């Protein structure tokens, strides 16, 4: 992220032009404001303190939901949402950097500097979403961005536009109250894909090219975890094993070498490996079991049943706990595939599509302790310490930049990527309060005993 202030990459204009559809200026449907008034009543904003406005938090989340930012879509995926957020951050007086992390994939980073020296805390999130699928499977418009019965509804409401709105307004609240150190607010591209935004951010941080940021001492990833404080996350490996033989007529299979039986042998070997890993390491108390799951098989032409294929490729989704060394596991699987191919007279190629190691931030790390304190301050109860079943951008920030991360955000763990996605307004506001308290604890130190 070269340069300073509001910068660009790949020719991006430093200051986005106003959106012709009114993204930056148009209000959310008036029903949202009315519903908020009814839902929040006299407490509207009171629980957030004078530094923040409850309605503004939900209004921003609703605006973001109304923007269709599907990560598999053509062209500029995050652009409209990034433009909205960048404009708001500039209004707050932050130093703003907008970059194209990959072609058509926009990220925005806002930096807020305190009034005295101190540590640097990062809030991190994303605005790309998975597809809504068949709209007929929804009972409402997937991009409604409305509040009904105390719930903000629509694709991306829980995962994780509510979390983005909460972290932006939490940082603003801390800014207005004064603080030590620095807050970095990063909305990074392509989390639902290969996490290209987080990878680019980590590279730029290592190169020292992020304006105003020379280090980051802790990261709060604002993904939906049902209000649990999650310092651990499963690792993930996306793997393809391609066996290569020789094509032949189905009537004369001896004229070729069929790779499909080798796939069957590999499937059995994967099951054996999973059994050994589970027997050796057991279930993780917060993450559950290690899983090696075959997900895709590509071989032959479905219209040519009489042709023996030359190649067969197996895709495997692997989920690990901190007990598993990915390098050792991948070496074992490569040896296994090689033996199977040799015995069958085949060629083989093992491709690691992506390798995301587990995250295991110590509970006594200051960023975890700050988030625990923030939850306690916001809710009056101790937080449940949990684990993230999938990978987040925090996985990449830990792997590539060595950053300590903890995941905490509004919305249920299991509602993401489903039809009729929603998040409770009360949970959005509780998360905002928790972020404010966590940031103050991390940056200023714990409050003095009364």
Residue spans of the language-model regions?
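Hydrophobic/aromatic beta-strand patches that form the interior of the parallel beta-sheet core
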Residues: 97, 119-123, 186, 218-220, ...
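Metal-dependent amide/peptide-bond hydrolase catalytic core
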Residues: 2-4, 43, 47, 76, ...
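Acidic/histidine-rich catalytic neighborhood of metal-dependent amide-processing enzymes
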Residues: 160-238
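Phosphate-handling active-site elements
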Residues: 148-150, 170-185, 212, 270-280, ...
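Short, conserved micro-motifs enriched in small and acidic residues
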Residues: 152-165, 172, 191-192, 257-260, ...
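Acidic-glycine-rich active-site phosphate/pyrophosphate-binding loop
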Residues: 132-147, 216, 231-242, 406
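Acidic/His- and Gly-rich active-site-bordering loop/insert found
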Residues: 2-5, 11, 21, 25, ...
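Short beta-strand segments
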Residues: 124-125, 186-188, 220-223, 242-244, ...
């Amino acid at each position: 992220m070269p340069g300073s202030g509001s910068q660009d990459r790949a020719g991006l204009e430093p200051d986005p032009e106003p959106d012709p559809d009114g993204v930056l200026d148009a209000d959310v449907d008036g029903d949202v404001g009315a519903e908020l008034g009814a839902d929040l009543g006299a407490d509207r904003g009171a629980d957030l303190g004078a530094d923040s406005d409850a309605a503004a938090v939900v209004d921003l989340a609703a605006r973001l939901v109304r923007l269709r930012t599907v990560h598999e879509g053509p062209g500029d995926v995050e652009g409209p949402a990034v433009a909205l957020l960048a404009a708001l951050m500039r209004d707050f007086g932050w130093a703003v950097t907008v970059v194209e992390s990959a072609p058509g994939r926009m990220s925005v980073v806002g930096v807020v500097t305190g009034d005295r020296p101190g540590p640097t805390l990062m809030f991190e999130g994303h605005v790309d979403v998975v597809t809504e699928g068949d709209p007929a499977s929804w009972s409402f418009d997937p991009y409604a961005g409305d509040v009904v019965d105390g719930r903000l509804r629509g694709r991306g409401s829980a995962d994780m536009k509510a979390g983005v709105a909460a972290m932006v307004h939490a940082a603003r609240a801390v800014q207005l109250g004064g603080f030590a150190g620095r807050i970095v607010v990063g909305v990074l591209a392509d989390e639902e894909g290969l996490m290209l935004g987080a990878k680019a951010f980590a590279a730029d941080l290592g190169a020292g090219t992020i304006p105003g940021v020379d280090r980051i001492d802790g990261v709060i990833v604002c993904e939906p975890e049902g209000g649990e404080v999650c310092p651990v996350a499963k690792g993930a490996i996306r793997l393809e094993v391609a066996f290569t033989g020789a094509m032949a007529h189905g009537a004369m299979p001896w004229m070729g070498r069929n790779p499909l039986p080798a796939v069957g042998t590999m499937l059995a070997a994967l099951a054996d490996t999973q059994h050994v890993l589970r027997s050796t390491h057991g279930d993780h108390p917060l993450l559950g079991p290690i899983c090696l799951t075959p997900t895709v098989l590509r071989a032959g032409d479905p219209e040519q049943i009489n042709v023996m294929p030359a190649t067969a490729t197996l895709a495997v989704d692997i989920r690990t706990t901190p007990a598993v060394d990915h390098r050792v596991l991948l070496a074992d699987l490569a040896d296994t595939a090689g033996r199977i191919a040799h015995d069958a007279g085949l060629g083989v190629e093992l491709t690691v599509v992506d390798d995301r190691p587990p995250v295991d931030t110590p509970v006594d790390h200051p960023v975890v302790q700050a988030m625990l304190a923030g939850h306690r301050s916001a809710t009056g109860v101790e937080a449940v310490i949990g684990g993230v079943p999938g990978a987040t951008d925090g996985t990449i920030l830990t792997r590539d930049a060595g950053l300590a991360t903890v995941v905490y955000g509004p919305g249920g763990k299991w509602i993401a990527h489903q039809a009729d996605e929603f998040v409770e307004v009360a949970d959005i506001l509780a998360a905002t309060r928790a972020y404010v308290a966590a940031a103050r604890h991390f940056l200023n130190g714990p409050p003095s005993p009364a």
